[in-house]
Amino acid sequence: MPRFPDQLLYIGGRYVPARGGHTFEVVNPATGEVLANVHNADADDLDAAVDSAKAGQRHWAALTVVERSRILLRAVALLRERNDALAELETLNTGKPLSETRSVDIVTGADVLEYYAGVAQALQGVQVPLREGSFFYTRHEPLGVVGAIGAWNYPIQIALWKAAPALAAGNAMIFKPSEVTPLTALKLAEIFTEAGLPDGVFNVLPGDGASVGHALTEHPEIEKISFTGGTATGRKVMASASSSSLKDVTMELGGKSPLIVCADADLDLAADIAMMANFYSSGQVCTNGTRVFVPRALRTAFEARLLARVQRIHIGDPLDERTTFGPMVSAAHMQRVLEHIEQGKAEGARLLCGGERLRDGALAQGCYVAPTIFSDCTDVMTIVREEIFGPVLSLLTYDDEDEAITRANATSYGLAAGVVTPDLSRAHRLIHRLEAGICWINTWGESPAPMPVGGYKQSGVGRENGLATLQAYTRTKSVQVELERYASVF
């Protein structure tokens, strides 16, 4: 018997059953417990959601910026008021420790919504005189109905990252959460309605890519798609969006990000950063710094510091406040991570710790993979080249700065990068040469609301967060005004 009742679609400000009658199970990855049967949307449901969104968007866009901002700020207050309950639901669905979801997931999502509610007034056009009797002005107009597809690792945070700028700019959004972790996106829809968002302005369609995701990307009345997920899927989404109606797209995709530890680095600080860049959220973070470059002479000392810190990881029940490391999000994903680990062993990487599924006691019921560190890695190894999206750190050695930069950039990805050094001149010199969209110096992982987030190369297109993203949910209209009598040449 599932813990929760059946979860329906959210269309037009209320819950409705899927027209096709199909459902899928959502499972707690820490225990294997079935949490709920979720209705699976299809193309017919999408058409209903689009009709609802079009009607709601006209009302929403007609409100003043101040009126829209007040509603969004009421949603912020409700999110913060219900932080603990939402965090517990997120933990049950994702397996992430409650200590994380309470302090990060809802908090940072609400921060982004508050940010866009505050800066929406910045959508101002320009007025430019052309001559004494003529000028033009520009205005930013909402796109209309936009679509978004979320990832499974930060379900409610990603939903808010995508909804906040879209709604602040006057659009309606149809959001498809990951079929693995759809529960909190539905709660977010409830909160938006309670806050006063017009019906249809935020619709949620759970379901898989084949039944509703593809239909969303190719629907002719959806003006933009924002997608977070793997690069291979991102290519398909982009192709579908462009071939159907030349939709604008934002893509936040995969990464294999480098963390460069410089020869003058504080090794304790560097080890702390490397641990957070690899084992936070059990390694299921797109920006993880999984390729850790350390000077050859410091390898042994650095390995010792990493191993000491692995001993401090508290693996267990995600609902236990002491837990700092939970399971993989699903059995299928756990298997993919374990296959990469076995490939690392087969290709000659030296296993320092972990490298196996955890089966002790209650952990056997869940999808737990031990924190894993490989040393003596080379650039051609599969674990160094491919995104694993799990708790697997690859340690590589280098001899000089130029070598480190060249090898760090030798990837098709370009999402994130980091440098650890007390010499800020060196830090900036290295960062400016690294081919990545998000870079950190002597820290890792923070993405505040005003900071644009996105990748180079095959790690993405466009940006999430920041002022430019608000503008990306609008189109610019140019209007020329002639004050004097128009002079025709005919």
Curated annotation (Swiss-Prot):
E.C. no: 1.2.1.8
Binding residues annotated for NAD(+), in chain numbering: 150-152, 176-179, 230-233, 254, 286, 387
Record's signal peptide: none
Keywords: Metal-binding, NAD, NADP, Oxidation, Oxidoreductase, Potassium
Site residues (Seems to be a necessary countercharge to the potassium cations), renumbered to this chain: 248
Residue positions binding K(+) 2: 246, 457, 460
Active-site positions on this chain: 162, 252, 286, 464
Origin superkingdom: Bacteria
Gene3D superfamilies (alphabetical): Aldehyde Dehydrogenase, Chain A, domain 1, Aldehyde Dehydrogenase, Chain A, domain 2
GO biological process, one term: glycine betaine biosynthetic process from choline
GO molecular function: betaine-aldehyde dehydrogenase (NAD+) activity; metal ion binding
Cofactor: K(+)
SUPFAM superfamilies per UniProt: ALDH-like
Manner of cofactor binding, per the entry note: Binds 2 potassium ions per subunit.
Job of this protein: Involved in the biosynthesis of the osmoprotectant glycine betaine. Catalyzes the irreversible oxidation of betaine aldehyde to the corresponding acid.
Membership in a protein family: Belongs to the aldehyde dehydrogenase family.
Protein name: Betaine aldehyde dehydrogenase
Native species: Xanthomonas campestris pv. campestris (strain B100)
Upper lineage: Bacteria, Pseudomonadati, Pseudomonadota, Gammaproteobacteria, Lysobacterales
Gene this protein is translated from: betB
